[in-house]
Amino acid sequence: MAHGPNYKVKYRRRREGKTNYYRRYTYVLNRSDRVVVRLTNKYVIVQFVKFDPKGDITVAAAHSRELMKFGWKGDENNSTACYLTGYLAGLRAKKAGMTSASADLGLFTPTKGARIFYVLKGVIDSGVKVPMGDVGVNNDRLAGKHIAEYAKKLEQEDPDKYRGLFSRYLARGLDPKDLPAHFKEVLNSIKSGEK
């Protein structure tokens, strides 16, 4: 592993691929609050964090599993769920007194149209200011119209594949073709439930 006497071992969290210390250092120097977005294989996690010398303080947070409390029956990590989770976290942050934050994407490499930007769009729409340029957030994808169109097409072409691919939606009692309407219902439920 070592390459001679001048080899410098990186910090443990950097070796594990968890922390970019240079980026974290810039956040600390800015003294700005951060909206930390992490995507796992199944879920979306959003936290609003303030810096403190003793350790970061989490002011508000939301997890995509919490969407089920508001009636969400879809997947917990698609673009629609990302938006709703960001919106929920933004409302909680506003209630806690945060008005603006910087996006902390961790080790994620920004790609146009990525799910992580749907989270930030949800945060912005909730009323928290986050600097974000044109990153390819599509309003049709935000509401799940692309999923509904694909489900409609697949049901006609290959019903077995349709039932297999959308089995979780169907088991939860949601027809994937009705996802845009379901999205609006859940969004209204979040707006009324988090006041």
UniProtKB/Swiss-Prot annotation:
Domain of life: Archaea
Gene Ontology molecular-function annotations: 5S rRNA binding; structural constituent of ribosome
Record-level GO BP terms: ribosomal large subunit assembly; translation
Keyword Signal: no
Keyword Transcription: no
Keywords, in A-Z order: Ribonucleoprotein, Ribosomal protein, RNA-binding, rRNA-binding
Family: Belongs to the universal ribosomal protein uL18 family.
Role description: This is one of the proteins that bind and probably mediate the attachment of the 5S RNA into the large ribosomal subunit, where it forms part of the central protuberance.
Name recorded for this polypeptide: Large ribosomal subunit protein uL18
Provenance organism: Metallosphaera sedula (strain ATCC 51363 / DSM 5348 / JCM 9185 / NBRC 15509 / TH2)
Gene: rpl18
